[in-house]
Amino acid sequence: MSQANAATKASSDVFFNASLEDIDPEIFGAIRNELGRQRHEIELIASENIVSRAVLEAQGSILTNKYAEGYPGKRYYGGCQYVDVVEELAIERAKKLFGAEFANVQPNSGSQMNQAVFLALLQPGDTFMGLDLNSGGHLTHGSPVNMSGKWFNVVSYGVRKDDHLLDMDEVARLARENKPKLILAGGTAYSRIWDWKRFREIADEVGACLMVDMAHIAGLVAGGQHPSPVPHAHVCTTTTHKSLRGPRGGMILTNDADIAKKINSAVFPGLQGGPLMHVIAGKAVAFAEALKPEFKLYAKNVVDNARALAEELKSHGLDIVSGGTDNHLMLVDLRPKNATGKRAEAALGRANITCNKNGIPFDPEKPFVASGVRLGTPAGTTRGFGVAEFKEIGSLIAEVLDGLKVANSDEGNAAVEQAVKEKVIALTGRFPMYGYQG
């Protein structure tokens, strides 16, 4: 073997066999530190969850090497016979999980899945209705700073001021007055049951298409803990993470063959090129997990834990927007503790409790300050936390907020936060995750 060939072989051996730790210790160190954070902190961000080891393996597989523009059986590249199997499994499992006739599993994110529906069903300048961001909607539901708010005429509906529940009379009135081409139901910070049947009745009355974004509650729908929108909506979108417990990505479901054709064309070639086959593999694995009987118990536990957390927080003098929760999340109004969302998020973070500041309906504060925090139970439930643990977590949150009220500063109350942090580490230590060192 020549010297040049020997050097090439040695380089190839390193390329295919050296570990991440050997090749890039900086990235390895950041990942190791993030694993430590996830292991030792209580994750209460409602849009986050923890995937299984099997999903991690699928998403970190050699499928990342493969381009597969198009759809199974109709690719623009050769060598797709095995990734076709992967995508077909993901599609069939998604259809079975949600009782849908058609599924597109290629969207790379929640924003892109919603953009694909708009591309398929709307023209620039068309009118659509969506839940106002301040009432619990999403940026892609018509926010002025988002493409959805820039390209279309958006009519927003909201919640009532007295009880923070959806005002369906207002939805009907706005629909009759504005004759939207599409009505979008669903949100990111609404803790009550959605009346899909009523939304469909309103849509039919004005000749609109009903789109449901069930990104936050898809796992609860799959687990039988929230009514399914699939029988009522013309088209449904959902992310595949959050309560569904899969990799980060999106999916579109429909029972309408004509809409399915438009959706497929909108996703590819309209919006995306080659799909992320390693992510689609992770989606397929997560769907298989969600089809198992134990996932129904998981979904029930998520809701039971959320209700327990909400009641515990109320017992400590905090207000829960709409008075409680029917799903996996809640908005906590911090004004009884004279706190802002910004201060509370930082103080809880120092105590190893992770959440996000969030505006509440009719919030007097700016979005980056906010009067509330949003809390969710999917990740903690995945770790094995039950009602007892979430009651303890509620008490720990109140302890931090009471300390913050006494300190009345951005620096918080170091003594209280350290004491709570030690309790959090003790709690999380009883519920280990993954077998890696961290």
Curated annotation (Swiss-Prot):
Pfam families: SHMT. Gene3D superfamilies: Aspartate Aminotransferase, domain 1 (3.90.1150.10), Type I PLP-dependent aspartate aminotransferase-like (Major domain) (3.40.640.10). Its EC number is 2.1.2.1. The record marks 241 as: Plays an important role in substrate specificity. Its cofactor is pyridoxal 5'-phosphate. The keyword Phosphoprotein does not apply. It is an enzyme of class 2 (transferase). It catalyses: (6R)-5,10-methylene-5,6,7,8-tetrahydrofolate + glycine + H2O = (6S)-5,6,7,8-tetrahydrofolate + L-serine. The keyword Amino-acid biosynthesis applies. PROSITE patterns: SHMT. (6S)-5,6,7,8-tetrahydrofolate binds at residues 133, 137-139. Catalyzes the reversible interconversion of serine and glycine with tetrahydrofolate (THF) serving as the one-carbon carrier. This reaction serves as the major source of one-carbon groups required for the biosynthesis of purines, thymidylate, methionine, and other important biomolecules. Also exhibits THF-independent aldolase activity toward beta-hydroxyamino acids, producing glycine and aldehydes, via a retro-aldol mechanism. Belongs to the SHMT family. This is Serine hydroxymethyltransferase.
